[in-house]
């Protein structure tokens, strides 16, 4: 005796997800799920259209006789026997339902389907079905063909169910070779237990477990599993952008892109982070943001195993390994691996500084520079050293500071092998070898290898001395000079020589003094070969060869090759005698004269004549 048989319905190949499973799907997977379900529904419908005589025997448990029922009405009939009401809204009247696919999900855990409109169907169709054992009228005529709805998803009773949306007018145009349904990859809902075992037509359709990529683009040759994906792809070649923004006129090839774009004008940010409350205009942006809280970094570099939380960051990182720099500056030809770096670089040519500080009005070419600058006003120092507890306003400064603890010096000079803990220090050092002086004074055309040296030099022209000593009122053009000067009043000498215990108020003075003990003279004159233990001494000596006397007296016009000589000479005009003897109160205009005078009080006579042994002070 043959087993009871039932018609194949969409429920036989339906795929259902629970709410928890749905949350785990990303937007691309959800879109793919929808496309698969739509295609399966089309294929089942096409079987009825291409073979209108395809019927199946259904054994009625209530009447004991056989009824001939079409696929389109079986599911509606069975829902009343099984008591399954999840699909009754679909079954009332397939012509009187209208749904609209929402292009963008309301949030990350809601199902992407909202019922927009539902037209009331006839309530007495149930009675018409069960009035007797008459076969149900064929509902698959031309009217059904012109209004055949597509499948969509909606959330109900903890399941992602299936609903119907719009008409398929081209279902009959799908060839038999294209009507191969995709085998479900998750739990298949089959509440009726009726397998279409004896149907050779269905067996033929289900032989292929995975759909072949039978839909090929004529332009690019790319193949797709589903005709809907092919249609979306072909829009790229056609340049078709049918969705236009009413505000700015920008056009898009997908409605969901237009919906997301409109939020730029409205400022709408419907997606909110539960951790920090930050809102976003796109669900993808919220998903990426959540990784900052979870620490998730799903994108990993195959070369160095470095992981990233954003796919775009991994793409940029890969260019480091490949050495790829696709973005080129049209002005100087310099290339960059990131378009943002090129944008910032272009501002060097244009002089554009679009980022302005609201506190002091200072402008910057980079937003990150403005952010760092703003911390000067707020005093914020969010970056803390775990070793010593020192805080910094910039992450890069903290990174450089950590190298003081570790002793790391990753930047090495290829010329002399000297190593540095900062990249900027290596760049400055390179200029010693190349002789490059990129910083030029606009007043006197003098050039410098360091920007700080240029800033100091400019103060000479404008006569600006912004830094004033609170003790004596003396002003300085550099804050470092003021700090050094302040030590004269305090008597502080924090730098101590380990050899003789002598103290100094400047670190450079200690370094120079240390060479007296070691005998080191690293500075050599290229003209005569004479060596010096101080760079300033070499510079003074070099002027003897060149005859250069850059220091001029404004009173008498006399010139000098050393700044100290000019200062000493200037006191002849002013009558200033800043050096005073603590013993007798006598004053002198030169420090050397005070030292000579001081020997009269001490009786010291350091200079001895070798012939007779007589000593002099």
From Swiss-Prot:
InterPro entries: KRAB, KRAB_dom_sf, Znf_C2H2_sf, Znf_C2H2_type. A zinc finger (C2H2-type) spans 215-237, 243-265, 271-293, 299-321, 327-349, 355-377, 383-405, 411-433, 439-461, 467-489, 495-517, 523-545, 551-573, 579-601. Keywords: DNA-binding, Metal-binding, Nucleus, Repeat, Transcription, Transcription regulation, Zinc, Zinc-finger. Residues 8-81 form the KRAB domain. GO terms for cellular component: nucleus. It is found in: Nucleus. One of its GO terms (molecular function) is zinc ion binding. The keyword Repeat applies. GO terms for biological process: regulation of transcription by RNA polymerase II. SMART domains: KRAB, ZnF_C2H2. Belongs to the krueppel C2H2-type zinc-finger protein family. May be involved in transcriptional regulation. This is Zinc finger protein 813. It comes from Homo sapiens (Human). The lineage of its organism: Eukaryota, Metazoa, Chordata, Craniata, Vertebrata. The gene is ZNF813.
């Amino acid at each position: 005796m043959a087993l009871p048989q039932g018609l194949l319905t969409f429920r036989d190949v339906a795929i259902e997800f629970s709410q928890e499973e749905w949350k785990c799907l990303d937007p691309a997977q959800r879109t793919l799920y929808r496309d698969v379900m739509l295609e399966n529904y089309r294929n089942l419908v096409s079987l009825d259209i291409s073979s209108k005589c395809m019927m199946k025997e259904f054994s009625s448990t209530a009447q004991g006789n056989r009824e001939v029922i079409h696929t389109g009405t079986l599911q509606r009939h069975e829902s009343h026997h099984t008591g399954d009401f999840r699909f009754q809204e679909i079954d009332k009247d397939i012509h009187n339902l209208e749904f609209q696919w929402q292009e963008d999900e309301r949030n990350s855990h809601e199902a992407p389907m909202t019922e927009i409109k539902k037209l009331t169907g006839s309530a007495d169709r149930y009675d018409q079905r069960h009035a007797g054992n008459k076969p149900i009228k064929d509902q698959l005529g031309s009217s059904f063909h012109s209004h055949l709805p597509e499948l969509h998803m909606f959330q109900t009773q903890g399941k992602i169910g299936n609903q119907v949306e719009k008409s398929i007018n081209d279902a009959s145009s799908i060839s038999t070779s294209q009507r191969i349904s995709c085998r479900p990859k998750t739990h298949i809902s089959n509440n009726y237990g009726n397998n279409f075992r004896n149907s050779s037509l269905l067996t033929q359709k289900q032989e292929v477990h995975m759909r072949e990529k039978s839909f090929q683009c004529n332009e690019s040759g790319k193949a797709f599993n589903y005709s809907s994906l092919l249609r979306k792809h072909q829009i790229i070649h056609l340049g078709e952008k049918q969705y236009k923004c009413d505000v700015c006129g920008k056009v898009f090839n997908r409605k969901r892109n237009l919906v997301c774009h409109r939020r730029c004008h409205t400022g709408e940010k419907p997606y909110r982070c539960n951790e920090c409350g930050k809102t976003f205009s796109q669900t993808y942006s919220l998903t990426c943001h959540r990784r900052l809280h979870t620490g998730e970094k799903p994108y990993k570099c195959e070369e160095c195993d470095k992981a990233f939380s954003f796919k775009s960051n991994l793409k940029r990182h890969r260019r480091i390994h490949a050495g790829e720099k696709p973005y080129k500056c049209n002005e100087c030809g310099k290339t960059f691996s990131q378009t943002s770096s090129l944008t910032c670089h272009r501002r060097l040519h244009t002089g554009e500084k679009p980022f302005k500080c609201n506190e002091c009005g200072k402008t910057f070419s980079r937003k990150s520079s403005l952010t760092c600058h703003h911390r000067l006003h707020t005093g914020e120092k969010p970056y803390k050293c775990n070793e010593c507890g020192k805080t910094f306003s910039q992450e890069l400064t903290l990174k450089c500071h950590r190298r003081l603890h570790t002793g790391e010096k990753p930047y090495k000079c290829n010329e002399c092998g000297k190593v540095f803990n900062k990249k900027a220090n290596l760049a400055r050092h390179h200029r010693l070898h190349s002789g490059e002086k990129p910083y030029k004074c606009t007043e006197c055309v003098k050039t410098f290898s360091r920007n700080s040296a240029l800033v100091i030099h400019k103060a000479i022209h404008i006569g600006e001395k912004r830094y004033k000593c609170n003790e004596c009122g003396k002003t300085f053009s550099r804050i470092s000079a003021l700090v050094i000067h302040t030590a004269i009043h305090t008597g502080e000498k924090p730098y101590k020589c380990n050899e003789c215990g002598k103290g100094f108020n400047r670190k450079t003075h200690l370094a120079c003094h240390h060479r007296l003990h070691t005998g080191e003279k690293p500075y050599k004159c290229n003209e005569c070969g004479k060596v010096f233990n101080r760079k300033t001494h070499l510079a003074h000596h070099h002027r003897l060869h060149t005859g250069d006397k850059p220091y001029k007296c404004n009173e008498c016009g006399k010139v000098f090759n050393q700044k100290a000589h000019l200062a000493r000479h200037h006191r002849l005009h002013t009558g200033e005698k800043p050096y005073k003897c603590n013993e007798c109160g006598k004053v002198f205009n030169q420090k050397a004269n005070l030292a000579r005078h001081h020997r009269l009080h001490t009786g010291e006579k350091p200079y001895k004549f070798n012939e007779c042994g007589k000593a002099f002070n």
